[in-house]
Structure formats: C-alpha cells, structure tokens
C-alpha cells in the first residue's frame, strides 16, 4: 500500500510538469499567428472555370489533368486569379500549382485523383525530412508564392484499401 501511494505521489507531481513542457505560451502562439499572411491573390481577380477550358466529365483523368494544369499556368502568367472547380466530380491526376493562383472548389465539387501512377510524375520533394525525387503528390507546389486552395468542395486523394494498402506492402498492418 505504501508503494502505491509513493507511485501515486510521483505521478501527481509529474503531471503538471508534463503539461507545462508541452504547453504553448500565449506569446509564442500570437507570434506564430501574426507571421501568417494571406496569399497575395487579388480579391477582384478574374475567375476561370475548368469546364470552360477543356475539362469535361466524360474524358480521362489524364485529359482533365492536362486541361487543369494548362489553365493554372495561364492564370499565373496573366498575373493571377481563381481557377474554379465547378459542382460535380472531376477525375484528374497530379495538379501543379503556380504563383498567384487560388484553386477554388465550389460547394458540391469533388476533385477526385485517379489511381494511375503515370499521372504522377517524379518531382523534387522530401520524405521524412530528406530531399528526394518521388511521385508527385496530388497537389504540388515548388518555388511558388501566393497560392490558395479554398471553397467548400472535396479533395478526394483516393486513399482507400484498394489503392493505398497494396502500396504499403507491410503485412503487419493487416
């Protein structure tokens, strides 16, 4: 019984120190929050719907990927604007963001990334802090500024048991 109370006392003394060590002080929180800036995308910038620039419901993910990436590059080259993903499901491959572009998903829009490795080119990225070349993530940005992903739509990366599980390749997970 004596041992139990000693252990309990030690635990009670350690709990506040653990909470203090992991806690954020308010000044640090405010410093970080104040360093965050909104992207420099003009609020009055023109909007470009992907459906008006070649993306369609009844085409391959590769065709939509090409149309979306071409539109993003065009909008960036024009000085910026909003690329709109309209309400519906749009299958695509990797999307590469460019400077001064807001990728906006309307309510009810689904940007669905296809499970086709050829649609994800090798790009410079990092894995657990190590720089490397790897398959592109669904949405990729490198050496760009002032980008945003906004709206009430859904980004579906396709992470389900049929696509992700076989790539994991580790039997200990199931």
PLM segments and residue spans:
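Extracellular "leader-to-stem" segments immediately downstream of a signal peptide or signal-anchor
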Residues: 2-84, 89-102, 106-174
């Amino acid at each position: 019984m004596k041992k139990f109370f000693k252990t309990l006392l030690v635990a009670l003394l350690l709990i506040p120190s653990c909470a203090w060590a992991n806690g954020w002080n308010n000044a640090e929180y405010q410093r970080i929050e104040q360093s965050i800036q909104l992207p420099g995308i003009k609020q009055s910038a023109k909007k470009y719907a992907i459906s008006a620039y070649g993306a369609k419901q009844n085409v391959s993910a590769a065709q939509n990927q090409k149309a979306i990436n071409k539109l993003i590059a065009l909008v960036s080259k024009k000085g910026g604007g909003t690329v709109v993903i309209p309400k519906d499901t749009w299958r695509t491959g990797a999307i590469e963001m460019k400077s001064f572009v807001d990728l906006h998903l309307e309510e009810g829009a689904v940007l669905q990334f296809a499970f086709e490795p050829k649609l994800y080119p090798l790009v410079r990225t990092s894995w657990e802090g190590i720089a490397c070349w790897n398959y592109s993530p669904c949405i990729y940005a490198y050496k760009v500024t002032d980008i945003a992903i906004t709206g009430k739509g859904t980004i579906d990366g396709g992470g389900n048991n049929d696509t992700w599980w076989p790539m994991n390749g580790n039997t200990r997970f199931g």
